[in-house]
């Protein structure tokens, strides 16, 4: 869910397409960025319906190790193909996940 929030500002078009195709979000009433954020809300609601945690706080994970986690994630270079993520971006996503 946090990743979709982060990507909503970076490259919303694919998320917007997913929101329209999977959740029926109307492309005439919402722009791409709005639909990307709606996708995040819809995914969160779906996961909650399945009784799955949607935040790190629900898993009792705080931000004290975010720097180490981000550094470990990119120790072999940036991750991701849609939008390459460096340590700063990963830390931002982890922060959104709180």
How should these model regions be labeled?
Residues 2-65:
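Gly/Pro-rich interdomain helix-loop hinge
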Residues 62-98:
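Short, amphipathic C-terminal "tail helix"
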């Amino acid at each position: 869910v946090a990743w979709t929030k982060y990507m909503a500002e970076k490259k919303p078009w694919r998320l917007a397409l997913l929101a329209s195709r999977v959740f029926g979000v109307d492309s005439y009433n919402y722009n791409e960025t709005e639909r990307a954020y709606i996708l995040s809300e819809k995914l969160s609601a779906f996961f909650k319906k399945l009784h799955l945690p949607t935040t790190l706080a629900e898993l009792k994970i705080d931000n004290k190790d975010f720097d180490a986690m981000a550094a470990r994630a990119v120790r072999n270079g940036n991750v991701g193909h849609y939008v390459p993520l460096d340590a700063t971006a990963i830390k931002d996503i982890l922060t959104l996940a709180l």
